[in-house]
Regions:
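Macrodomain-like recognition of ADP-ribose-binding/processing modules
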Residues: 1-192
Length: 192
């Protein structure tokens, strides 16, 4: 438990969860899966390729209302969302997670923490008292400075612990077998 919230870390496929499923996007909520803008093997790419109606997804993103302190702006001629912003789509929470420049998703460690702190507030705003499943954010192809799986997981849990966001449902962090093999979960449990 972290701040009274049941937090579980488990191996699995996030798409099989019946909870809210958090999916990271870049700051533009791009939807082009072409192995340049979005890689097919990324969680983002797999999510988009599962959809029947990408136009519906784009419409929902474009029609999402601005949120105080999370207003959209124009960057490089495109609508850009602040890191941490969540747009709800079906049973998914779509997260503006990374900057996108020169066809690369990038995030400094400082921006990673800022994004996570904003994300917990956004989850609190939209989760409607339903449990949440999240992946190991930053564990994929996003270029994060100084990343390793243990530190990413610790940072996710630390920002939850220090967040003031009222969340009253369980959170499951869904990891791949490959990722679980790289993390000493006993050390994580000792910290929290």
């Amino acid at each position: 438990k972290i701040k009274g919230i049941n937090v579980k870390i488990e191996e699995g496929d996030i798409f099989e969860s019946t909870d809210w499923k958090l999916i990271p996007f870049n700051e533009f909520f791009d939807t082009t899966v072409d192995d340049v803008v979005i890689a097919r093997n990324s969680l983002n790419g797999k999510f988009i390729e599962r959809l029947q109606d990408i136009d519906d997804l784009k419409r929902q993103i474009n029609e999402a209302e601005d949120v105080p302190r999370m207003k959209r702006k124009i960057k490089a001629g495109k609508i850009c969302y602040p890191l941490g912003r969540i747009v709800v789509y079906q049973d998914y929470l779509l997260l503006a997670f990374s900057h996108f420049e020169n066809n690369q998703a990038k995030l400094s460690h400082n921006d990673y923490e800022i994004c996570l702190r904003a994300m917990w507030n956004e989850i609190s705003r939209v989760y409607a008292n339903k449990p949440i499943a999240i992946p190991l954010l930053g564990g994929g192809i996003t270029r994060i400075t100084d990343k390793n799986e243990f530190n990413l997981l610790r940072c996710i849990l630390c920002t939850l612990k220090t967040s003031n966001a009222p969340i009253y449902q369980p959170i499951t962090i869904v990891l791949t077998r490959e990722t679980i093999d790289k993390i000493n979960l006993y050390d994580i449990k000792k910290i929290f």
